[in-house]
Amino acid sequence: MKKKILSIICFILASSMLLFTVGCGGEANETVEATDTQAQTEKKTKKEKKTETGKKTDMNMTPGQTKTDETLTERIYDFSVPNNCFRLIGRTKSTGSGLIFDHAVSAIEFQGFMTGDVILNVTSNKESYFTVYVDGERVDTRFGASGSKGLTIASFEGNYFHVIRIVRQNEVAWSQCLLRSLKMTGYLFEAPEERDLYIEFYGDSLTSAFGNIGDPSDPAPHDVPKYQDATQSYAFLTTEALNADCSILAMSGVGIATGHYEKHFLHYFSQFCHKRSNAKFEFEGARVPDIAVVRLGANDFSVGCTKEQYVSRAKELVDYIREGYKKDVPIIWMHGSRGGDFNNWLKELSDYYGGEAGGFYLLELGWRDHGVGAGGHPNVASHVANSESLLAFIADKKLIK
């Protein structure tokens, strides 16, 4: 009898040591909704939390090719625990609950030896969508999450070195998202280095890419993020072509002075995330952009705006950027063609900062010359064309040293 009881106890103990993972994959170009994960595996007491330290990276390692003969074990990287394994890009922030992942093209990047499934645990109050890059290549699958979910963002065979980047597709207005943890078999190195160039974009739906992947016949209700992919916006495409890091601060309907919201642009984006609290964005310790690109005005004109309102708020934004970062960041002010009066407003604004000699540049371009997506907004082809125009402008003005 004692032997039988002992056998049962041993079986239970052995079973409890196995971690069961739940996730989902998908075919190319399929939108993948997440499955529920065992959140209890992530829960740790404050006493158990300690800083995670990634191993030093061998610069000679090649993603997808360098292999290890080590036996890899399963690990959970808790994002509420400080560590040096993840590179945070844009307005992505570490908190005691996880990584705040609210803004368009917020991103994280990590590298290490991995095998089997790599599962990202996410909590989002509404639909959020993500693009994943593995070893520099964009994965065709679109990943989506709502609630507390787990996403199998990659599956590997063999014990190879890989680099993964996860980028949010939707703007801050649609959902608020926390990255909770990463579960994988293997281990991570120190975070990848920053790219040499960093560009920050300020705008509305034309910059956040609302409607760019929708059908032209669809009215695109403004609470549905499925029509939007900021990783196919002119802003992100431009930075990818330059091998630069990107930050997008943009919201559909917002104006620099008026627009479709009660407040103006700077009221919202001088906060780290206005949907969470009114805590101001802290410039200290933040990465300083090499170029700032502003594209605001469409919503001001759709509801009405005076020259005094527009120019005054535009000056506030430029001063906010330059005084906050303590640097005369070159400003590219993108705009559409709106006639003589508006051109005079822009000339006054440009002259105030000394024009191109003062690092203030005006770029006029169309916004949907190559077709529309949902809600009458530019489709991906139009964003590609805008990106090409912006790249040519940056090269012509020699804005990259």
Question: What is the meaning of each model-derived region?
Answer:
Residues F201, C246-I248, G359-E364:
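Conserved beta-strand scaffold positions in the cores of enzyme catalytic domains, especially
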Residues Y198, D245, D328-P330:
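Residues at the starts of beta-strands that form the adenosine-phosphate
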Residues Q271-K401:
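Alpha-helical cap/lid subdomain in secreted, periplasmic
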Residues M1-K2:
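N-terminal hydrophobic targeting signals that begin at the initiator methionine
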Residues L13, M17-L18:
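Hydrophobic core
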Residues I5-I8, C24-Y202, T207-Y227, K401:
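N-terminal secretory targeting modules
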Residues H103, D218-G304, S337-N343, H377:
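Conserved SGNH/GDSL esterase-like catalytic core that processes O-acyl groups on lipids
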